[in-house]
């Protein structure tokens, strides 16, 4: 049984996530086999690219049912970037596309014309930004309020229930930077690119029981 399975569905820099786990002393298997995902103790869903394409690849790769089974079984599950967005009901990127609907809510685009401190803000939101911690899953046990993490995204998730928001950040608007629901932790930012803070998240996720 693979302790940690990173889903390879053709969308994302999977090796960087795998190397992140290696840096904190854990082996993670990158797999395109739904059976390996189904048998894993912990599962990571990264994601880079368009929501529509990511969801299509999950479906075509046969990953949807294994993902839902892992989540329903209560096994630790980590979503990263678009991997977080896919957990929501739908996204308006390039139309309206259905997600996994594990966390009720919608994925929206940053509005045009945002300004902050008198400056126009460009989309995508790219670079380092601060977290405001709202709730603290075990994966965030070493993350300080105000910690800086690395983002690259034009869309953000808006949960129907505020209670699932683990952290927010601000870029013209306050937006959900991380969610926590039962055995699911998911981040809009990239822990594998967020240096010591991100590595602590990967380490504590690897140590988590649920």
Curated annotation (Swiss-Prot):
Record pathway: Amino-acid biosynthesis; L-histidine biosynthesis; L-histidine from 5-phospho-alpha-D-ribose 1-diphosphate: step 5/9
EC number from the UniProt entry: 4.3.2.10, 3.5.1.2
Molecular functions per Gene Ontology: glutaminase activity; imidazoleglycerol-phosphate synthase activity; lyase activity
Pfam families cross-referenced by the UniProt entry: GATase
Swiss-Prot/TrEMBL catalytic activity: 5-[(5-phospho-1-deoxy-D-ribulos-1-ylimino)methylamino]-1-(5-phospho-beta-D-ribosyl)imidazole-4-carboxamide + L-glutamine = D-erythro-1-(imidazol-4-yl)glycerol 3-phosphate + 5-amino-1-(5-phospho-beta-D-ribosyl)imidazole-4-carboxamide + L-glutamate + H(+); L-glutamine + H2O = L-glutamate + NH4(+)
UniProt-listed InterPro entries: Class_I_gatase-like, GATASE, Imidazole-glycPsynth_HisH
Cellular component GO terms held in the UniProt record: cytoplasm
Subcellular location per the Swiss-Prot or TrEMBL entry: Cytoplasm
Enzyme active site: 81, 190, 192
Keyword tags: Amino-acid biosynthesis, Cytoplasm, Glutamine amidotransferase, Histidine biosynthesis, Hydrolase, Lyase
Keyword Chloroplast belongs to the record: no
Domain of life from the UniProt record: Bacteria
GO biological process entries: L-histidine biosynthetic process
Glutamine amidotransferase type-1 domain boundaries: 3-210
Function: IGPS catalyzes the conversion of PRFAR and glutamine to IGP, AICAR and glutamate. The HisH subunit catalyzes the hydrolysis of glutamine to glutamate and ammonia as part of the synthesis of IGP and AICAR. The resulting ammonia molecule is channeled to the active site of HisF.
NCBIfam families to which the protein is assigned, alphabetical: IMP_synth_hisH
Subunit comment: Heterodimer of HisH and HisF.
The protein's name: Imidazole glycerol phosphate synthase subunit HisH
Gene: hisH
């Amino acid at each position: 049984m693979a302790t940690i399975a990173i889903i390879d569905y053709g969308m994302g820099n999977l090796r960087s996530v795998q190397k992140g786990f290696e840096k904190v002393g854990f082996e993670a298997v990158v797999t395109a086999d739904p059976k390996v995902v189904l048998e894993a103790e912990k599962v990571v869903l990264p994601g880079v690219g368009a929501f529509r394409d990511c969801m299509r690849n999950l479906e075509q790769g046969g990953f949807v049912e294994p993902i839902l089974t892992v989540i329903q079984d209560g096994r630790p599950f980590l979503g990263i970037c678009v991997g977080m967005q896919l957990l929501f009901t739908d996204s308006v990127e390039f139309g309206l596309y259905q997600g996994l609907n594990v966390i009720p809510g919608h994925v929206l685009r940053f509005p045009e014309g945002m300004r902050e401190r008198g400056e126009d803000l460009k989309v995508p939101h790219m670079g380092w930004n601060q977290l405001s911690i709202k709730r603290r899953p075990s994966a965030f046990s070493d993350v300080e309020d105000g910690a800086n993490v690395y983002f690259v995204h034009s869309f953000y998730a808006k949960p129907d229930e505020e209670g699932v928001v683990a952290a927010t950040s601000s870029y013209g608007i306050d937006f959900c930077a991380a969610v926590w629901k039962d055995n699911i932790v998911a981040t809009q930012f990239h822990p594998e690119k967020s240096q010591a803070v991100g590595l602590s998240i990967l380490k504590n996720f690897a140590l988590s029981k649920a």
